[in-house]
Amino acid sequence: MNYKMMGRLIAQILLAEAAFMVPALIISLAGQDSQAILGFALSILVILAVAGMLMFFARRAKKGFYAREGMVCVGLAWIVMSLLGCLPFWISREIPSYLDGLFEIVSGFTTTGASILSNVEGLSNGMLYWRSFSHWVGGMGVLVFLLAVVPVSGRNDGFTMHLLRAESPGPNVAKLVPRIRSTAGILYILYIVLTVVDFLFLLAGKMPVLEAVCTAFGTAGTGGFGVKNDSMASYSPYIQNVCTVFMLLFGVNFSCYYLLIMKQVKSVYKDEELRLYVGMVLGSVLLIVINLRGFYGTFEETVRHAFFQVASIVTTTGFATTDFDLWPGFSKAILLCLMVVGACAGSTGGGFKCGRLLLVFKSLRRNIQKMLRPQRIQAVRSNKQVVSEKVLENTNAYLAAYVLIIMFSLLVISIDGFSVGTNFSAVLACFNNIGPGLELVGPTCNFSVYSSLAKIVLIFDMLAGRLEIFPILILLSRDTWRR
């Protein structure tokens, strides 16, 4: 295990985290929020000190770096980044409990959007910015940012691929161009452009600048931290519709946008995962609109809320324009199903992913056909390409781990004594990086009702869900740390 190289990478991530806090510090200085200024200033100093110690430890690091190190490095980096990223909340006392602050920042970095805050509007502007910016950083991945922007000594394509595979969502990682660093750069350019366009559309709707920035960050990262207690409910229909469109856009595999730029429209049109994603959204909206007849005053309002909530849940953003916990049971069941499926692989969205769902169904169909015709050899194909047995094996392992973690988490947090509906939706909301659940953790409530043990379990769920389970589970394996 190349501990020194991992230490150097984590140090560089912490340096980036300290730099990310500077705009929040400037906003706090402009607002003369003394506690927030103290929180960010001390946090930056602590992070720089830890980064300095890691850099000292990592001097003369060897360049060898393999898949195991990649997984371990990603898992450790996200944990350390979260443990230090919550310091501004705690030092400023805007969130007095360190565990609550950790829950909040993990929810931010993992783009979950689950909160322990009853009064979001009570936070200072700097804290609101930092809270939302954590979504934007976590959406595409801090290590993808590192690979795209920060020069790392001794880096090569094998090295970067191990990191990209460990942090990127989906059953497989595809190169857009031959060099991995260029792929990471293209992803971030697309991400930045879409975020800026979203921000400009929000400004056009007369949304205040800071609110537009925070909302754009939350939409781009499909995170869902709002700056108002009622999330998006008090904004105009125009702003709600803008958010709906951009949530759906950020739920699409970013390679589709690259193919469109390369004028490969036919490839995008024939993409099976994209077709499933679009069909799922349209079908869900249609069924919910039918189920909500007479629930709202006008048909336009019904369609707007249905489209917004479907987009918010399927992309795992978690914004809300209405209390969907009051919807009929059938509509809530649709939303629960969308929580599980999630967005496309290669997007900023969470969940099981449409791509994985397709592979599971195709693998199931092949197994049934094998039972009927044992002598027949049939490959599983995705977009007319044969899917390797290794990818199918990893997908099945992911499904097994996915179900087991949900079962374990549900059992542990049920100790608190809340209803099965509250606990099950809380686990789904955190593990799939969605945010709001149902009942006591619905869109008008928060997660402060849970005990410290339950919050720790949900923090684990958020990290495991964002990092696609294995980088976190590998940290818990004894074999990982053996020579």
PLM features: residue spans?
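Membrane-proximal intracellular helices of multi-pass ion channels
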Residues: 1-483
